[in-house]
């Protein structure tokens, strides 16, 4: 599959857009564009979707920093014994599907993103296709706090100089015949919760 990166976007618009090259922790170089207007941002995102429209779906992720380009699922952040974490997680998921009546009707590929949506740590990454939602997450910092063995997530304004919106390309463009809202590719899977579940499951 051919993935097309956005190059020379600063030359495609009359706006004052700055492009810098950043080397990620993995050694790969990426372009980071400084964009100051929603109009330019919308054009930038649209261009990224356009040049990848044959084999990829481009979605968005708002972040307060780049984290060296690492997109690590919440289940594995700060962890080293990944096999052990995965085994415990698999057992927990199987127990939930078996014992929680509301969830028994849903396949695991749909249940996991739902739980991720409500703050449970899973191997999934949250992505959106709405620029305003991505901007909100880019402008707000999340903080976890544990009280009486319960973990709470608080959001507060990002005080950093820059906020980031990542364009994430997935090759999961083929809709599964037997699973509404589930798309599969060679390297990735994508679950659109708006199609996979009734709306009363989804928080604002």
Model-derived features with residue positions:
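Catalytic-core elements of nucleic-acid end-processing and repair enzymes
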Residues: 1-204
């Amino acid at each position: 599959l051919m993935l097309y990166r956005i190059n020379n976007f600063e030359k495609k618009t009359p706006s004052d857009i700055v492009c810098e090259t950043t080397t990620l922790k993995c050694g790969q170089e990426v372009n980071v564009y400084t964009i100051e207007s929603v109009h330019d941002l919308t054009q930038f995102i649209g261009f990224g979707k356009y040049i990848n429209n044959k084999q990829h779906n481009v979605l968005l992720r708002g972040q307060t920093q780049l984290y060296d380009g690492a997109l690590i699922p919440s289940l594995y952040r700060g962890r080293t014994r990944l096999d052990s974490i995965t085994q415990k997680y698999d057992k927990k998921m199987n127990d939930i599907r078996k014992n929680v009546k509301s969830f028994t009707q849903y396949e695991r590929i749909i249940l996991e993103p739902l739980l991720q949506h409500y703050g449970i740590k899973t191997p999934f990454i949250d992505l959106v296709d709405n620029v305003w939602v991505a901007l909100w997450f880019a402008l707000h910092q999340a903080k976890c706090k544990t009280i009486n063995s319960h973990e709470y997530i608080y959001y507060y304004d990002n005080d950093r100089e820059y906020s980031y919106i990542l364009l994430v390309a997935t090759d999961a463009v083929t809709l599964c015949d037997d699973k509404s809202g589930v798309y599969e590719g060679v390297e990735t899977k994508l679950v659109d919760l708006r199609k996979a579940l009734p709306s009363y499951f989804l928080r604002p």
